[in-house]
Amino acid sequence: MRSFLLLAAAVSFAQAVRIVQSNDDGWSEANIRTFFDVLNSAGHEVVLSGPAENQSGRGSSDEPPKTVDSDGCIHASCPGGSPPTGANATDPRLNYVNSFPVTSIKQGIDVTAPKLWNGAKPELALTGPNVGSNVAVQVPFSGTVGAATYAAKTAQIPAIAFSGQSGDPTAWNAPTPFHSKIYADLALNVTTTIINSGKPYLPANTYLNVNFPSVSETKCSDPSQFKYIFTRINTGLLSARDADWCGSTRLPWEADVILIRGSDCYVTISPGDANDKTTINDAAVQTQIINKLKPILSCLP
């Protein structure tokens, strides 16, 4: 399998940025840990601040973290009775927050990252890759999306939410699943493209909802096989016309592309409104984002 780690090695320190990571599957999930390693190898400064437990489907819920219960953190990654927040014993960049995804990324943005970076705050927020897709009716309830929209709207930090159709919850210390490696490489490609486009990385109050298709060692098995499609989160039947792209002023629906046509190795990238998590219905803003992503975008046949 070829890897975008080759691309990562080419990222100069001048392009390296400060990144905060979170998710809703838990801080010790293999997907986010694999992505952390890839981002670190690319030369970025990365702080991971994720929930102590699986918080899937919690949307934009937010409450102060509490002492970890007697069961401990997910995947036995911290013992029962641990403090409300904590860090890996050997790597202070890896942090848990015993609360919701929004609370977790907020802790990372406001407390943990500035503490590790001499007061500096993140320049980019990345959530996921989520275990499972986040399309259509799933989007408003997704903690992965909720954390990204908090970063984009409240913290005013450009944010990207990543989700992958394949895989089951896996501990950080289990053998790294094939899907985690592929999704980390694909997520790095999107991230690097946005960074290389220059600041501001995204228009204010917008986020990207990125979904990866099902992968296996026999189908969609190499990063070079994937095509990135610019899509909508919702269908847009009653919305104003979209940006003029790929010969149309109506972007394809991400659910149709990822769930029905995903076997063609399509990655969907949808521009989201951080205020309500739906598609950003502004053709001019969509065009700005298209221009940033244009080096990797393709059109559907």
Region roles according to the model:
Residues 40-41, 87-89, 117-120, 153-154, ...:
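Extracellular/periplasmic catalytic domains that process cell-envelope and extracellular macromolecules
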Residues 1-17:
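Fungal secretory targeting signals
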Residues 174-301:
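Electrostatically charged, flexible surface regions
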